């Protein structure tokens, strides 16, 4: 419907602005999805990441409290599987101990505990959704899954020579962002505020994601070598299409994230497999192949 959405400017580093906005709008629900959400960037800009990802959550909660909306406004905080970091349990669930392993994860842990504190101290309906990796065709291009699907499409169209990646053995639990948003909403419709893991319960390597993205573009990858010497070749032509570049390794890397969505399935009735992993890769690869075709057409104009 036209004009059904009103956009307001807001900044998680500006407490007075957030208080003004919350007081003006008096929302029934707040979904805080704002963050500096790139792990590698948090090593490059740790202070900024802490200001937005840690104190930003506090500013949202405090805005609700200061405006007198603790009993009428629900708050959802987008937390992260990166909290588990150097994992102490596989798969990870709501009771798994946290071991953050990056400035991003440390900042997010502060936000997680502030949500619980405001819930307990002020009786707020404030909840954390511990989101495992959620991807889509709208994913930022600096994230590995989108980097892969864009490269696969461009290579298939002759626009790019090869793809460089970091740790090919990293294990991730990848789901479709659209399905995860449904779970966020379900969490906020409960009578009792609780924290939930949002995950598929299935994990794959970066290597496997790469292989499937190229397959969706009609290219079969043949792997040779190990570690930093690993390379992926086009099985049909023998051309090297994928290689490892140590530049893309993180100073500290989380290598085994795997969520247990049992609580979300049981309590919320949520289906984490609405979109399968294979379908997710296909959606992203198809979208980015079409984009590569448009780029090629413009290049040839």
Task: Provide a role label for each language-model segment.
Residues 1-134, 178, 184, 188, ...:
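N-terminal Rossmann-like NAD(P)+-binding domain of SDR-like oxidoreductases, especially those catalyzing
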Residues 3, 10-11, 141-147, 151-301:
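C-terminal substrate-binding subdomain of Rossmann-fold SDR/epimerase-dehydratase oxidoreductases
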Residues 84-86, 137-139, 205-207:
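A short beta-to-alpha transition loop/helix N-cap that caps and shapes the active-site region
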Residues 19, 88, 139-140, 210:
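A short local structural element in Rossmann-fold oxidoreductases
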